[in-house]
Amino acid sequence: MGKYIYTYIENGQMYEESPSLAELLAKEGLSCEKIVTGRIEYIKVKDFETQIKDAQWLVFTSKNAVAGFAYNAGNVVPAGVKVAVVGKNTQNAIRTACGIEADYVSSKATGLALGEELMNVVSGRVAYLCAEVTSGSLEEAMNEYENLIKIPVYRNEPVDYDGMEYDSMNCGDIDGIIVTSGSSGERIKWLIDRLEDVLVYSIGPACSKKLMEAGIVKERIVEAEKHTYDGLVEAVRCRADEKPVMIYDKNTINIFII
């Protein structure tokens, strides 16, 4: 198998117990190189406790949101407040950070899925702990829910690249670019363009949408069926083995043999 570039966002949160993407790729015998596309900074929210004290639900769509909550609240969820999360990784983060079990875990690891499902579950004031800039998926799904408030607890700051390092890269050795977030895809658009027809592996629908909006043609995007690091590795392995993979389309996800 060839070599892959994967995007990475640096953060200082402590709730990562699962293997890293690099470890999972190495386990499959895949050579990879990291490109840092951002750095997580946590936001100190004014009157944070006041903002959440009347909430019936706290909603988290990432481990960074859990860490941002802990940065403001000291790992203590107010008594009587229920917690909803996206997927198992965020569920594990809440368990590790706050010592509690989430009351609701989405069936799919996307903000869109969580938002759609919560419309039939929640009542009262819902506090959505999120990034300063979000994909908008959960908000779109809960557009008709009038008592949803957004509380940004972290931001994803871009970083400067070492242009010389990437200018000297032997692009002929690269078999794919693995993109772990929509913002990362936007930030390395220049590298995706430079690598021309190399496939771009996307972690999920929101990421694929951002790639398309940035001008990446749909034929280049391979979307992970499971929107996790494991799912990304499976997508890469399937493509390398010429097995069926998920190809992103504007309206549907179809399976093709490539």
Regions inferred by a protein language model and the residue ranges of each:
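Signature of uroporphyrinogen-III synthase
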Residues: 1-258
